[in-house]
Structures are given as structure tokens and as C-alpha cells.
Amino acid sequence: MADSKEIKRVLLGPLFDNNPIALQVLGVCSALAVTTKLETAVVMTIAVTLVTAFSSFFISLIRHHIPNSVRIIVQMAIIASLVIVVDQLLRAYAFEISKQLSVFVGLIITNCIVMGRAEAYAMKSPPIESFMDGIGNGLGYGVILVLVGFLRELFGSGKLFGIPVLETVQNGGWYQPNGLFLLAPSAFFIIGLLIWALRSLKPAQIEKE
């Protein structure tokens, strides 16, 4: 029987209290690479959430049958299989987005969040709790990704999901797009500001010197 309190903790905790990017500083590379557009940020969020949830679920199911000496290999094999499925689905049904995400879908295999939850939680917890933990951490990762993608696309090109929101000077409007937001360093600054804002609201997350 699944523990409802534990499910609530693992599902909601990673959103703000224990965010994978803002607190644990994991998965930052893909956060820089796929957030120039809100659309790619949302798709990457869905992909990572599904892979993290299902890999944790399957690893938890067989955790008592995995020899300790090969557990990392087994975890990576399960994660890689799920990533291949996600990649093929994107190629089949969202080819343009698949091209934009490029190698970063494949690199979900080595994403610290996915591997970390498999090793730290799924290997020690029941399947349902592990699945919900995967959902929670995927969404926690996605909250930061979507916020960064929102700001970068809006201020970098005046669009959201490719639809003009701020009328640009080139089209007779008032907004001059800020090209800096389309460069990778801007994502560093935005993530840094989000971490600062979150830790200002939750002082307990500030590291002790």
C-alpha cells in the first residue's frame, strides 16, 4: 500500500523545497541548451519527466534482483531503452522539435537527475513511490526550464511558442529584441537569479559557510 504522505512529499518536494536545479544544481547543461524557445523547454520537460518516472518505476520493480556490482549498468540500460523510445516518438511525431533538441534528448541517459533518482531513491523504495518521485523531480527540473525558456524567448525574440507577443521594431512595433537572451550566458544569469529568489524566500536552503 502506497504511503500517501510519502507520495505527497516526493511529488511536491522537488518543485521548490528540493529543486534538482535550484538546490542540487543538477541538469544545468541541458537547461542552458534547450531553453532558447519555450516550446523546446516544455518538450524537454515532458521527456525528462517520463524517462525519470518510468525508469525509477522499472528499477524499483526489480531492485531486489539486481546484483550490487552491476546495478549502475542495469540502471543505464533501462534509462537508455526509455530514452530511445522517447527519441523515436519525437522523430515520428514532432520531427522539427526533435531536430532542435538535437543530441540533448540522447543525453538524458547521462542526466544526473535521472541517474541520481534511480540510485538514491528507486533502489531503496517501492515502485509507486519511485514513480511519483520521478514525476516530482522531472517537474521540478521542468519548472526551472520553462521559466528560463519563457524569459529567453519573450525578451530575446518577443515571441512565445513562436507566436509574436511583443510587437518588434522590425514589424512596426515598439519592442527591440534583446539578442543577449538568445545566447547561452543569459541562461546562467537567469538560473542564478531564480536560485537567489528561491533561497531568499526559503532561507533554510542557503548553504552554511
From Swiss-Prot:
This is Na(+)-translocating NADH-quinone reductase subunit D. NCBIfam families: nqrD, PRK09292.1, PRK12405.1. GO terms for cellular component: plasma membrane. It comes from Serratia proteamaculans (strain 568). GO terms for molecular function: oxidoreductase activity, acting on NAD(P)H, quinone or similar compound as acceptor. Its EC number is 7.2.1.1. InterPro entries: NqrD, NqrDE/RnfAE. Pfam families: Rnf-Nqr. One of its GO terms (biological process) is sodium ion transport. Composed of six subunits; NqrA, NqrB, NqrC, NqrD, NqrE and NqrF. It catalyses: a ubiquinone + n Na(+)(in) + NADH + H(+) = a ubiquinol + n Na(+)(out) + NAD(+). The chain crosses the membrane at residues 42-62, 66-86, 95-115, 131-151, 178-198. NQR complex catalyzes the reduction of ubiquinone-1 to ubiquinol by two successive reactions, coupled with the transport of Na(+) ions from the cytoplasm to the periplasm. NqrA to NqrE are probably involved in the second step, the conversion of ubisemiquinone to ubiquinol. Keywords: Cell inner membrane, Cell membrane, Ion transport, Membrane, NAD, Sodium, Sodium transport, Translocase, Transmembrane, Transmembrane helix, Transport, Ubiquinone. It comes from the Bacteria. It is a multi-pass membrane protein. Belongs to the NqrDE/RnfAE family. It is found in: Cell inner membrane.
